[in-house]
């Protein structure tokens, strides 16, 4: 019997019908949504023709929520309930947020991600971001008069697992199917057409409202290979605004300001900063609530001076990304500029001097990421031909592994490994009859688990009892195209399995990532010595446990003198294990103790063979 295909009324049966997928740039200051129409990407404007949606959400006492321009109007009059720059808080705890004391919000410190207290209740950054995403989804569906099948949402390349997962959760809350999380620098490269026809190595310098990213990419016949990434997810245009704000406070000799005056003056400083991108002079002119008039002039040169250390921080990250990629500045064919903050002349000049080439900025830096995301979304929706396809090879920023016996780290996936990736490694039990295994997943470059960051723990139970070292436990790490990690463990013989999707309560700050990398490099020799000692200590403990087990069952095979000799040898080994810090001394003690028990091991083997053959004739053997 033939099967009939039944379509939804009003829907086309044409197999070539385009599926509408969008690209979303969920930014710190502004957010955008874009689609591909007539083979070209375009940012979708609202009814007033505005292409940028301010990333601002306001909560009202009556339960209503405002987002975008409507909410932006309330920044000064209702600062506690009007949330700006929420991207800075995604996947973060209170201790992770820089300059938190200057923020006008009431923060709620909870295990995991922080929350913000509003008249509508405590709100997580995920909930706030979901409001912005929901408005973008509605804008897209109204523009195309159809439902969207999904979205490619961009994130900073240096976003960690917690920040990426928080972004996906926000999209889910907004009713958006995430086709992929795409790193912002890669999206920008796609938008610039650095795809099929382009060869060479490019840098993407992305300085947005709240985040900074630098990525080094190699283009080769449609393959985007990310060689290295760097940046700071807590550095952006907001920090330039704050630096200018502090300077104005100092120049005008103002006392500590109220939340209302703080927001008012900060907005005036932001406006002056933007004017200075195209004018040599600007003025911060604002009247405070008590009638005080602030009137401070500032030149381009003065702004450059007070923000120079912020620009320098981005250049340090650029140099590190080059080192990680094994390249020099002269190896870079071009530099793509992304983000509204790259309009600042001192930023463009500094980047040009570092790389020795004029940066590419012919596309609108506010739109370029969304345009690239739209092109990737169109590809994933199946709307482009094979000739238009490209392959994206992003990387993970820090090594991933597990803690083994003795607190050592066994790295499963090294840093800068292209994703998606799956790696497996076999491990075994440490003690006889061991029926469970605790697995701690860690992230970092150090040799000891205590020096790395724990991402999660889980247990594999139900391992059949057997001798130490006999069980085979296969641990598999999988990192998907979004950079999210899952880990599974399987006992090969029985098929017993356990797994975990890594969703840390909150993620690493970029300072932590940098610190972990630096500590990994600077402590390499010290770490290797510590690892060597731990390995020998594990060997010693394994021998002590094995001999103790053997004596408990077969002590009768030894005479009193032999028993005393082994007991003395084991006591000496235990003493060295407890007190010695030189791995070579521990190794010699283990070797000596092992030789001292060789005769006992031979007697046990002979007794075991004799027992197995007892009562059998030659024909049965």
UniProtKB/Swiss-Prot annotation:
Cystine crosslinks: none
Gene3D superfamilies in the cross-refs: 1.20.1270.10, 3.30.420.40, Actin, Chain A, domain 4, Substrate Binding Domain Of DNAk, Chain A, domain 1
Kindly give the InterPro entries that the UniProt entry links to this protein.
ATPase_NBD, Heat_shock_70_CS, HSP70_C_sf, HSP70_peptide-bd_sf, Hsp_70_fam, ISC_FeS_clus_asmbl_HscA
**PROSITE patterns, A to Z:** HSP70_1, HSP70_2, HSP70_3
Q: Name one Pfam family in it.
A: HSP70
Keyword line: ATP-binding, Chaperone, Nucleotide-binding
Q: Which family, according to the similarity comment?
A: Belongs to the heat shock protein 70 family.
The record's function comment reads: Chaperone involved in the maturation of iron-sulfur cluster-containing proteins. Has a low intrinsic ATPase activity which is markedly stimulated by HscB.
Q: What protein does this entry describe?
A: Chaperone protein HscA homolog
Organism whose genome encodes this protein: Polynucleobacter asymbioticus (strain DSM 18221 / CIP 109841 / QLW-P1DMWA-1) (Polynucleobacter necessarius subsp. asymbioticus)
